[in-house]
Amino acid sequence: MQYPTIKASQDASDNLGMSTKVTIAEFNEAITDEFCAKYSQDGRKLLKVPYELNGTYSIKEGVRIICDEAFLDLCSLRSLVIPDSVTSIGERAFMCCKSLESLVIPDSVTSIGDSAFMGCGSLRSLVIPDSVTSIGGGAFSGCKSLESLVIPDSVTSIGGGAFRGCYSLTNIVIPNSITSIGARAFEGCEFLTNIAIPDGVTSVGEYAFWGCNSLTNIAIPDGITSIEKRTFLDCKSLSSVVILEGVTSIGDDAFMGCESLNSVIIPDSVTSIGRGAFWGCWSLNSLVIPDSVTSIGDDALRGCTSLTDIVIPDDVTSIGNRAFRGCTSLSSLVIPDSVTSIGESAFGGCNFPNDIEQELISRFGEKIFG
C-alpha cells in the first residue's frame, strides 16, 4: 500500500487536543506504510514503528506528533529524518535506539518528552532548535557518546535526569532563559569540565551534578535559596565554590566527597549547614561560617583533614554528632556561649591542645571526643 502524502497545515491550532499517547482506536484504524510503520488515519501521528526496521528511516511529511514509544528498542536504526511538520516528540519515543548515530530535530519541534532519547548510546552530537521550550526528564539520559550539546535560549527548564550518564559530554552551555535544573540533571557526566549556572536559575534539584568528576569550579547564583542534598556529591575535581547571597541553607551531603575543594565562601544569608554537607572535603583548609548560621548538622565537616582552624559564630546553638570528627589538623577552636548542645564524637580524632580539650570536656562532657 502506498502511503498518502499529507499536506501539513500551517495553522498551529491544528495541534490542539492532540496527545502523544496512542489510543486503541487509533492503533486499530492505523494506516501502514511500506516499512510497516503505523500512522493515524489523518496522517498527523506516527504511532509505532516495527522492531525489525533498520538503517535509515524518513518520517512521512505532515506528521505532527511522534507518539510515546514509537521507536522504542529499535536497536538497528542508525539515522532518522524528521520532517519540519513535527511539533512534539513523545515520552520514550526513541528510548534504547542504541545504534542511532545522527539526528536533526527540526525547528518546528517545541517539546521533547520524558526519556525521549534515553539510552541512545551511539548518538554523538545534537542540535536542539530554538523552537524547543522544554526538555523532559531523562530526555537524553544514558546517551554515553554525546560529546557536545547546545541548548537554545527558548528552553526554560531542564528536566530531572535530562543528561544523566552522558559520560562523554565535556561542555554544555546553559542559556540565560533557564529557570530550573531538575534533580539528577547532569549526574554522572564524568568529563564535564565547565558549566555556568545562569543568574535566572532559581532551583537546582537534588543530585543535579553528582559525580561530575571533572568539574573544577562553580558559582551558585543569588536566585537560588537552597542548595539541595547531594547536589555536588563526589565532584572530585571541584576546587572552588562561590555561593552568592540569597542561599539560606546548604543541604545534606551537598558537597560530600569533593576532595579537591579548598575554597568555599558561605554568605551571611545561610542559616543552616546540613548533615554531611562537607564530609570528606580533604583539601578544605579554612572555612568561615557566617553569623547567620544557627546550627551545624551531623557529620557536616567530618573528615576535613586539612582544616586547621574554624570560627563558630555566636548565634550557633547546636553542633551535630561527628560534625568535625576526623579533622586531624584542627588545632584551635572557639565555641561561643550560645552553643548549648554538642553531639557525640563531634570532635573525635581532633588533635586539640590539652587545655582546649579539657575546657570542652568540662562544658560538654567526654562524649564529644568519643
Question: What are the language-model segments listed below?
Answer:
Residues M1-K38, R44, V49-I65, L74-S88, ...:
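Structural signature of tandem-repeat unit edges
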